Regions:
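Short beta-strand/loop motif that positions the catalytic acidic residue
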Residues: 188-190, 194
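Domain-level recognition of soluble alpha/beta enzyme cores
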Residues: 1-66, 252-262
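Alpha/beta-hydrolase active-site loop
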Residues: 79-82, 89, 112-143, 160-162
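Gly/Ala-rich beta-loop-alpha elbow adjacent to hydrolase catalytic centers
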Residues: 149-154, 158
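Alpha/beta-hydrolase-fold serine-hydrolase catalytic core, especially in secreted/extracellular enzymes
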Residues: 228-229, 233-319
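Short substrate-entry loop that stabilizes the transition state in hydrolases
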Residues: 47-64, 69-106, 195-198
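A conserved short beta-strand
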Residues: 97, 165-176, 184-185
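Conserved alpha/beta-hydrolase "acid-adjacent" motif
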Residues: 195-201, 224-225
């Protein structure tokens, strides 16, 4: 878009990228230029996205339905390539717009906090229209139906986006409590040790939705569904960033990503299964009924559920 970047992941034919290397993304490149000089040089974290930039889109199986990812605060559009790229590899074109008002790239700049929740929804829907009119992708994308996946503040964007008839379902990950604008199927995910959003409030949101699945993942926290979490866990936290970013931002970035937390890679593997299954069901891509159950977690070693469609046993303090 003219005033902010949009990222799009889409299916490609394996032969079209044969011999090429997938894109490597370093999260330090999205940190605000105001802060970048204060960041130690060894704190960059390279992530193999598994995606190939500017590859020709697959055409044989299209048109492909759509999902959108709305990042948290502060966050960035490439924060969850473990999920966005995975969806694209399973036939779902996935869009992510940079919400400049809550972007890591605008932290401590005049743009920070400038956008309203309604602005964020407008940006997301404008990005959908942009992809639909794109010369390369327009012929292979189905923009008539979309699932919106929101993390933290992005869950509010997802919930409000249900006012648009094209949004057929939402996945809300550690989401700020926000009622849906219109009733839609929902996957509602809480993280047991979330220090920012009380799982009990997420449970209450789940109860307010007619068709909703509630998943509470054990031993992890708020930042589990971002690419950087396993890297943060590997290095033992983000202590070196406290002076540059402030203690509150660092605590939020570490939440669920410290060595004592559940293995972040296992958590993300489990999220891929639940989210992809839900997206397939909401978009009508399944030939039969989807059976997302507590036993689904048994498919991934090293991670457990604290509850499935069950109230958190001991409510945490206010986040």
């Amino acid at each position: 878009m003219d005033d902010r970047p949009v990222e799009v992941w889409y299916p490609v034919e394996p032969t079209a990228v044969e011999g090429q290397s997938p894109e490597i993304f370093d999260s330090i490149n999205v940190i605000s230029e105001v802060l970048r000089p204060l960041i130690p040089g060894d704190l960059g974290g390279e992530i193999d996205t598994g995606a190939y930039r500017d590859a020709p889109p697959a055409t044989a199986s299209g048109p492909f339905p759509t999902a959108a990812y709305s990042h948290g605060s502060p966050g960035y559009r490439q924060a969850a390539t473990f999920m966005t790229g995975h969806l694209a590899s399973h036939g779902v074109i996935t869009i992510a717009v940079e919400h400049l008002g809550r972007s890591l790239s605008t932290l401590l700049t005049p743009l920070a906090g400038a956008d309203t929740p309604e602005d964020d929804v407008t940006d997301l829907l404008n990005a959908l229209d942009l992809v639909g009119s794109d010369l390369g992708l327009g012929a292979v994308v189905d923009t008539s139906r979309m699932v919106v996946i929101g993390h933290s503040a992005g869950a509010r964007t997802a919930a409000l986006a249900t006012a648009d008839d094209r949004v057929v379902g939402v996945a809300l990950l550690a989401g700020v409590p926000q009622e849906l604008a219109s009733n839609r199927p929902a996957l509602v995910v809480a993280f047991e040790n979330d220090a920012l959003i009380d799982p009990a409030s997420i449970w209450s949101l789940h109860q307010s939705i007619d068709n909703s699945v509630f998943v509470n993942i054990a031993g992890t926290g708020h930042a589990a569904p971002i690419d950087a979490c396993p890297l943060i866990q590997d290095r033992g936290g983000l202590t070196e960033l406290r002076e540059a970013l402030g203690a509150a931002v660092v605590r939020a970035g570490e939440d669920g990503c410290l060595p004592g937390d559940t293995d972040a890679r296992a958590v993300q593997d489990l999220l891929r299964i639940y989210i992809t299954g839900f997206v397939y069901e909401a978009l009508g891509l399944l030939s039969g009924p989807l059976n997302l159950t507590a036993e689904t977690a048994d498919l991934v070693a090293g991670v457990e559920l604290r509850g499935f469609n069950e109230s958190p046993a001991v409510p945490l303090g206010d986040g």
